[in-house]
Amino acid sequence: MKHFDHIVVGSGASGLTATLLLALQGRKVLLLEKAPQVGGSLARFRRGGLPFDTGFHFTGGLTEHGLLSRMLRALGLADEVEPQFMAADKAHRFVFESVGRTIDLPCGLSAMRQKLKADFPGEQVAVERYFDLVEKVCAQTGTMDLSRLTEPSARLDEEYVSLKDVLDGLTGNALLKGVLSGLSMCYGVKPSEMSFASHSRVCYDLYESTARFKAGGETLIEAFQRHFRGLAVETACSCWIEKFDDIQNDQAGKALLNTGEEVAFGSVLLTIHPRQILKLLPPEQISKAFVERVMAFEPSLGFFTLFGTLDGGSHDDTVSSITSLFPLTDFEALLDPAYRGEQALVIVGNEEAVGGVRRRTATILEPAFPQAMEPWQDTFTGRRPPAYQAYKQERVAAILKHLVRYDARYGEHFQTTDSASVLTYRDYLHSFDGSAYGIKQKLGQYNLIGRLPVRNLFAAGQSALLPGVAGAMMSSFIVVRSMVGRDAFNRFMGTRLCN
């Protein structure tokens, strides 16, 4: 029987980060991935030779002192990825269709303050107060700064108040509230359900800058894999844990894999959905309260996605800005699973060199919730019924109609390459429900992070801390500290941050 110091389950951003952090400290690590390839939603797929991003479309935190940049430096990966930043004057373009207003958001909190005060001359106090609060939350959050990761953290007052309540207290201007809620598409929770603290932590680095990696998330996967080769890391794809065994003194000693192999371990980090974690825990080791807590977690937003090309004409703005079309200013409605009006769209353009030819691609994201997929929950890719195919055709037609109404050039130049539903993501990524951000990060909720009832099992991932690549990676920094011991991890981080 093989023995590993640690097993990491799931090879998305969190699992890759944890594996490298553990291996860099001399640990022997087994990385398990249920899919045929590592990387999760960081990976790309290709149609007609053109690459498209599966789930990692853009991120914040890639400025010199940004959180993601600092994590990449600590991992030794910073020089192996190349950020491509959105336009400084309009990283995000918000089009509020019901009121006929377009608001461009520049990079940098200072520039954004000035821009929004100019756009909303009667709301200058509200704008200043909002950004003051965002900066206050992030300054008081130790995990937003790797050099302060070892500091004890306390829950802030802003953990207990919703984004909606804060915005309602600042202004009665519906459009301004819509602008300040716009990046909620990056975590998929209604303003009344999201704490202002969590909203601030997600948005802060996106306000400072928005970027993608050249060659997409694949370049990050490849960087991790290069570093694994010189370390005690073994990777197994199409492989997962069926059950834990040899439970003694509230600790598991070995895991039975789907291959029939048994492996022994010191500890296991599970970067998968909390419901999937729950299925792995021996029933006699968990309380009714623990089960109820996990079962109460709700799915976050997912997306119906249209992939295509934009050859011909001028579409520079689709490459340099993230454009969001919002039919309403009310994000309580737009992010409600029960909403049946016209959906928002997020347009992410890119430019790729294929065979020496520059091609423009566009990924169109339309909000969709796992709940809407209930009629087809028990079906799988390639074996869906006609009603599901009709649903996909209906969504594609609605998205194309919406795009052309916004800009007639899409009718002339956009060519559909493929489409994906929430179920497509679920099956392709081997995820629990196909949601984009794991569980909803709800006000007053205690996520599953760190040590589990089986005491040498741990939880991390974007459902554990914050959604997105940076949140998933940061959860691994926090939990690996518990796995290897605070003092040892602090010494390790001291050397990495000095490099």
Where are these regions (language model features)?
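Mid-domain catalytic core of redox enzymes
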Residues: 242-357
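Rossmann-like flavin
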Residues: 98-194
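A conserved FAD-binding loop/helix module that cradles the flavin
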Residues: 462-487
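N-terminal glycine-rich phosphate/pyrophosphate-binding loop and immediately adjacent elements
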Residues: 2-129
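Short beta-strand to alpha-helix junction loop
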Residues: 63, 152-163, 204-226, 387-395
